[in-house]
């Protein structure tokens, strides 16, 4: 039997929890190491399954990769030595196991002028096509087609261009950005993603010698350079993990201090928790959430940064399920994310969906049941729901959670949560 979590509800979460590096940042930073011959070092890397998977992808492209412990628990140092001529075929099994593997496309085009990248796997949260990635590469002078389950791209040379994205896609912004840093001339990306992870990537690329302006705005301007050099870079704190702990504190009427993250990256999320009745305080490297009473109902609508993150939608539904009043949650990014609601209904949630909307009428307490994770964030949301359910909830397919939450069980236990990992050895 595969591993599962046993979550017994009833305890408040109280204490302090440290957040490691951002999953949505570290994998792209690792891919960016392909852009420079030599050894790049990335610190504050989270201990999640996708990091060794990305290491396997890079090894398949000719890099030497080592992962060493940096601090007790959940942080590592990743060292990547990139050869003078990386391989350009990324069509082996590791590539298909997680979505972020596609971010090697841009660096391979920049260094090799050709790339064969297997279509990636990852979370089952709806359609995430590569159309914008391919369109951006074509504007830079490449051809790009889907052939035999792979993205196949080629170029004699890459030239700067003005590229307007139909939607501020994080992945498309990253791939076009990494291709453009070594292209000839100026590239302008209009309607670029503004996420902190994009800013983190831009900061690392600038340290490597790239010329980029506009990071954190909707217009990125890149002046191509002839070559980049290796660097050392520290990954930003994971705002999604940090917000998960904040929402968990609110759901359990707890008191949790979260460190290792820039609270400015979570301004809207923390405002929503304040609207739900939480007391929020800040310091230099984190925030504290104190929820004195049952949370009040709050409406949520997911949007690209600086809007409410789609990755936190399952946790928002979990909060709404036990809040006082009725909440509406609108999903504007990934249409299939509401399949999580079916599992919440197993736990007794009064919820219904209609297209991009979910209406949740809060009840004082959920009831335990066996539930199944469909993706990283849904899994975390189900664990949080189990913390406010009567009895013991079994959360299955927890390998999803391990892809995004380092030492999740241990950190919950440190805050007083009654959570146990079982199975896997039968």
From Swiss-Prot:
<feature type="binding site">
    <location>
        <position position="333"/>
    </location>
    <ligand>
        <name>UDP-N-acetyl-alpha-D-glucosamine</name>
    </ligand>
</feature>
<dbReference type="InterPro" id="IPR001986">
    <property type="entry name" value="Enolpyruvate_Tfrase_dom"/>
</dbReference>
<dbReference type="InterPro" id="IPR036968">
    <property type="entry name" value="Enolpyruvate_Tfrase_sf"/>
</dbReference>
<keyword id="KW-0573">Peptidoglycan synthesis</keyword>
<feature type="active site" description="Proton donor">
    <location>
        <position position="123"/>
    </location>
</feature>
<dbReference type="GO" id="GO:0008360">
    <property type="term" value="P:regulation of cell shape"/>
</dbReference>
<feature type="binding site">
    <location>
        <position position="99"/>
    </location>
    <ligand>
        <name>UDP-N-acetyl-alpha-D-glucosamine</name>
    </ligand>
</feature>
<dbReference type="GO" id="GO:0008760">
    <property type="term" value="F:UDP-N-acetylglucosamine 1-carboxyvinyltransferase activity"/>
</dbReference>
<dbReference type="Pfam" id="PF00275">
    <property type="entry name" value="EPSP_synthase"/>
</dbReference>
<dbReference type="GO" id="GO:0051301">
    <property type="term" value="P:cell division"/>
</dbReference>
<keyword id="KW-0133">Cell shape</keyword>
<comment type="similarity">
    <text>Belongs to the EPSP synthase family. MurA subfamily.</text>
</comment>
<comment type="function">
    <text>Cell wall formation. Adds enolpyruvyl to UDP-N-acetylglucosamine.</text>
</comment>
<dbReference type="GO" id="GO:0009252">
    <property type="term" value="P:peptidoglycan biosynthetic process"/>
</dbReference>
<dbReference type="GO" id="GO:0019277">
    <property type="term" value="P:UDP-N-acetylgalactosamine biosynthetic process"/>
</dbReference>
<comment type="pathway">
    <text>Cell wall biogenesis; peptidoglycan biosynthesis.</text>
</comment>
<keyword id="KW-0808">Transferase</keyword>
<dbReference type="InterPro" id="IPR005750">
    <property type="entry name" value="UDP_GlcNAc_COvinyl_MurA"/>
</dbReference>
<dbReference type="GO" id="GO:0005737">
    <property type="term" value="C:cytoplasm"/>
</dbReference>
<keyword id="KW-0963">Cytoplasm</keyword>
<protein>
    <recommendedName>
        <fullName>UDP-N-acetylglucosamine 1-carboxyvinyltransferase</fullName>
        <ecNumber>2.5.1.7</ecNumber>
    </recommendedName>
</protein>
<dbReference type="InterPro" id="IPR050068">
    <property type="entry name" value="MurA_subfamily"/>
</dbReference>
<keyword id="KW-0961">Cell wall biogenesis/degradation</keyword>
<dbReference type="InterPro" id="IPR013792">
    <property type="entry name" value="RNA3'P_cycl/enolpyr_Trfase_a/b"/>
</dbReference>
<keyword id="KW-0131">Cell cycle</keyword>
<feature type="binding site">
    <location>
        <position position="311"/>
    </location>
    <ligand>
        <name>UDP-N-acetyl-alpha-D-glucosamine</name>
    </ligand>
</feature>
<feature type="binding site">
    <location>
        <begin position="23"/>
        <end position="24"/>
    </location>
    <ligand>
        <name>phosphoenolpyruvate</name>
    </ligand>
</feature>
<keyword id="KW-0132">Cell division</keyword>
<dbReference type="GO" id="GO:0071555">
    <property type="term" value="P:cell wall organization"/>
</dbReference>
